Amino acid sequence: MASISNQICSADQAICNNIASVGNRDLLSQNILSQLRNLIEGIIVFTHSANPEESFHYDKVSLAMEVVKQNGRLNFLAKFHKLIQKSASHYTFDGDTSERLMLKYYEYLLRTRKMMNVHYGLNILNNLEAFPIDQDPSLREYHERIADQINTSMVSNQQLLTPERYYIHKTRPFFVNEEIFYEVTFYRAINKATKADRVIAFTSIDITDKYSAMLTLQQDAITVIGYTMPIIIIRQWEVSIRPCEFDNLAKLLTISKKVQANSKEYRFIMNILTTESSNLLDIIDMPDNKYEVVKANATNGVVSPKLFPILDKARYIIRPKLAGHNIIRYLMLTMFNKTLKSQFDRGGCANLSALSLKYACIPFDQMPFCTSLSGHNPRYWDLVESLDTADKQHELLVRKVKNNVDHQGVLYTPVAELSQYDNLDTLIRTFNNNLYYKHRSTRKLISDKGHVFVAGYEIDTAAIVTKLKGKSSHGIQGYTEAVERWLSDSNRDIDDALKVTALKQLFCKSYVALIYGAAGTGKSTMVNHIANYFNDKQKLFLAHTNPAVDNLKRKVSAQNSVFRTISSQCYTAENTNYDVLIIDECSTVSNADLLSVLEKTSFDLLVLVGDIYQIESIQFGNWFSAISSFIPSDSIFELQTPYRTSKQSLLNFWNKVRSIDDDIAESIAQNDYSSVLNSKLFQPSANDEIILCLNYDGLYGINNVNRFMQSSNPNPVYTWRETIFKVGDPILFSETGRFTPVIYNNLKGRIKAIQQAPGWIQFDVWLDRPVSQFDVLHLNELTWISSSVVRFTVYDHPGTSDEDDDSYNTTIPFQVAYAVSIHKAQGLEYESVKIVITDANEDDVSHSIFYTAVTRARKHLKIFWTPETQQSVLNKLSKKTNTKDVHLLKARCGL
């Protein structure tokens, strides 16, 4: 039997040999993952043993693990071990997934090496730096400056903000001189919050992202690329679950309790969660004797315990695995108020141990890895961490097939892609048999013609095709002649022969017309021509986002026109019959939304407008690219003449990206479209300029770029909690409930004036829409000041985070918007466009996203990225084609 030290040394040697000998990161990661568990278990036993030369037995691991969990200096080893058990020890990953895991583990390995060297004098993982963790070099200077500020020990209390409770959205480690630091994305722990409310800060503290936390923040700044950039540093941290979240968990468990943040038992539990890096499930899963000790210590001297009756009831459900235990386990891992409230049903559910849960929660309790909770889609790794992963192969199979649909737009998954699942037919049968009989027809898996798919997706797609084919079976007699006469009589100036031809032939063979067109080819102009021909008819214009709807309003000059978002149309109760229904930006419309529109809207003629190469729908949406295979070709028109720009260099570049030519990189270099991250990002190239980012988080996400850009605004600073505002800031509204219908989601504006006093802040805001005093007559909290300028106040109520508060007036209803997301820019255009892409989000840059971004520019284009990121993005560009899905759909559904 090997000794403890031999166990460590052999695993260490295997890991180091792999790092030294293999250059391929994917293979390297897979080799290392198989050794991680051996190394960490050896170290855990080593820290507990007085004699490292003792024989290593696996039965020593569990005992040593319990000791390690209680040690604040060592408990990260238990956390690391748990992560390894739930990943490499249980699943076989492809290279890319293993690599991502290794990058996550790199932090733990660095901590392990430092701990073993400093406290035990042992040197392990000597060549860990040779593993290519591939940090973006463009961020290195920022990270070094941030690390310097974090390591500055002299911090006065005047520099610190009052501690506030925040939700931790995610943490991301970065490394400077073998030290570990964290980029933390967080937002206020209140019920009403959006992606735009997220803030990033930096710290050397290892903060859990499972629960809300009390953070003490420091407003600071760093100097990089000649600019002073504001940053936030987290100086102190402790777990601080909102009391209302315990109250809502209690309701689910049929208990009525009011937990107080200042109670002894609350503070005791928060201290355990903070100092031991543990979660509530660690307490729930304790042996009875240990749990009773913790309970006794927490409630000693407490007359009427509030928190432990909740934990007692949770243990009663979870320990014997009663019905509902998976739901309660998952909820206790994350304790997110909105999710907790969404599961509540006062009437209770007899099938879930009579807990106050919705019946809609049953599928998740039975098959959590392939279903969702009410109004909430759990993250995969949260499921792995909170639930038993044994005997879940049928669920993981379904998850794989559904991911192909939702993320790849692939309706039919080839059986060859599912080779890792043994006994495929048995797994499919197991899943289908576990479905509720009323759901089986749409949710069941089907294996046919060498492919596996979810029945409901096929049913919806076939229903859309059937409805549109029915509408396209006949056209309008005399339509072409009528249009020709209208063109002659109205002297309408249409400067594109393709548009004239399309207008004449639009409905002569079909009641459905498709208008495709590359970016800038005048699709909106074509829509306006159609609208004006049908000027005296009732017309409904739909688009997915408010900016796209606003764009239609600006472009369409015809009378009798109604404009709505897709979602508002899906929920409208009107029964107006429209002569013409026009849907813009069709690539962004999901199958489910289109089917809802077709079923709920009465119309005669249908015009579908969009570009299959621009951003696709977030949910499954294959209909727009597939429908051209099912309706008459005479009703399909493609606009080709570009009007957005006259710059031939831009046009050539757009065409190369659209068709994914081999010389995209050469075109970028020739036209100087590329730059590393530098001061040019913050120097305007035109008045009409926008910075486009892929997402909200990260050093170069939307929210932080907004902070950087705001620092160039010379007006005085107004600080509201962790956020800064200045007169002159451009803004984008994200909250609609408080000021509906005057202010709506994605409405643009600009701050004109700010007043502030303890407990409140008041804004005068110019809105990018006409507003009169009459418009705000019935809105008590909105005051009209002058032309399109309105005033409102936001309040700061102490204890808002403790209570289950759904009020709007404590939330800033807008975001500072020097930068916006690529998704929100679809359908819009700017004289100058700057795009920021870092290695943190390069994997999310699809062909449609990249093409949409670069085609927003009329004159100036600059992409800020490293050469490595550019190469990675360009190499991964590929068009999503669904010809196989179309053939299978025709064969299976008789279409």
Question: Where are the regions a protein language model picked out?
Answer:
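Extended low-complexity, intrinsically disordered and solenoidal helical-scaffold regions
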Residues: A2-T203, Y211
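N-terminal accessory nucleic-acid engagement/regulatory domains that precede
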Residues: Y120-N127, I133, S138-I476
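Short amphipathic C-terminal alpha-helix that caps PH/PH-like domains
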Residues: T461-S472, W654-V657, A853-A857
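Conserved adenine-nucleotide phosphate-binding loops and their immediately adjacent elements
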Residues: Q477-S490
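N-terminal pre-P-loop "Q-motif" helix
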Residues: S490-Y511
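ASCE P-loop NTPase helicase motor core
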Residues: K504, C508, V512-A669
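Conserved RecA-like ASCE P-loop NTPase motor core of nucleic-acid helicases/translocases
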Residues: A513-V556, V609, I664-F708, V717-I724, ...
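Core RecA-like ATPase module of SF1/SF2 helicases and allied nucleic-acid translocases
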Residues: T521, N560-R564, S633, T645-Q648, ...
